[in-house]
Amino acid sequence: MSIEILGMVGTKDFSETHGSFVDGPPIDVPYLATFARAHEAAGFDRVLIGYGSSSPDGFAVAASVLHATERLRVLIAHRPGFVAPTVVARKLATLDQLTGGGRVAIHHITGGDEADQRRDGDFLDHGGRYRRTGEFMSVLRRTLTSAEPFDHEGEFYRFEGAYSSVRADIPLYFGGASPAAVQTGAEHADVYMLWGEPLAETAERIRRVRQEAVRHGREITFSLSTRPIVAATEAEAWERAERIRAATAGRVSGGGLGWSKGKSESTSVGAARLQEQGAEREVHDERLWYGVTNLIGPGGNSTAVVGTAEQVAEALLKYHDLGVTTFLIRGFDPVDDVVRWGDELVPLLRQGAERREPAGVGA
């Protein structure tokens, strides 16, 4: 069965191991174009454009990426609550049609850091944010697909005669690990995004989301986000992991990352679970490495899969066996890793997926 392979682009050269989040211009246009084209040349299907309360606007960045490439698709991270879903629907559909159709998707991030929420003026509590996200996704989908005006009155939004003359088939991605997130994503998302956790925990999360989706008469697909660390031999891959750990540790202690462990006001259930798993042991399932996770504290996608290209592909395909059909992979050396993966890892993932069928598909 075919899979979808996602990367992630940034507007400047920065990762846990090098560059600066806070120093220098926030947007390097030539770098962004090079980064996007590297993904396209390496055979990626789509790239995620992240969201933060102090980051460049994702819709504008997406337009730049789409302009710089011919086939590469984008996944725009968006935090519901600040722009009406009817407006977001028109923005998405317009961008999609202007770039040939079928190249735009949206990833709903409800928000798990109270300080980051407040920077944009959001003081809603955790449960309220997920209720708002669910209502947002419902209105968004209806606006994208309805050929007739409609009215809506809910807890957070009220519209009379809502209608968009420009419509598109925009996939709705979603992420979250709390019970409220499971309820919201299972009811509204097309793709449920998961962080890289051990196989047993991932299988249980997929089971829970599918069970909730059945209650709504829906089927849902799954994405897994990890940070591959690949080298010619397994020993060299683990040596590279140690170099990444050392570089990250030095930057955390010196403040070079622009954030530091303990300063987050995270309410993210998923981030807390990653911290617990990393504290339990540093390596799970032979290759899932928490070395960076343990250093940077609550945050985003930080668990790595370490080994040769063949070993990493096989480790990721074990998640495919559980039902994962989308993989989001990003590196610690962002552009160079993408180029290397295009030579080996991406083809190996596609070839391996064609030879196996994920759980819950084709039954």
Regions found by a protein language model. Name each.
Residues 3-9, 47-49, 73-78, 104-108, ...:
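Hydrophobic faces of well-ordered beta-strands that scaffold small-molecule active sites
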Residues 39, 43, 65, 95, ...:
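Conserved, mostly hydrophobic/aromatic
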Residues 24-38, 174-184, 308-319:
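Short, acidic/polar
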Residues 41-44, 101, 189-190, 324:
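A structural motif
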Residues 2-12, 119-120, 126-165, 199-321, ...:
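An alpha-helical appendage that flanks or caps ligand/catalytic pockets
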Residues 46-65, 196-200, 328-342:
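Glycine-rich, proline-tolerant flexible connector loops at the mouths of alpha/beta enzymes
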Residues 1-69, 166-170, 361:
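N-terminal beta1-alpha1-beta2 module of alpha/beta enzyme domains
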Residues 82-97:
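Glycine-rich anion/phosphate-binding loops
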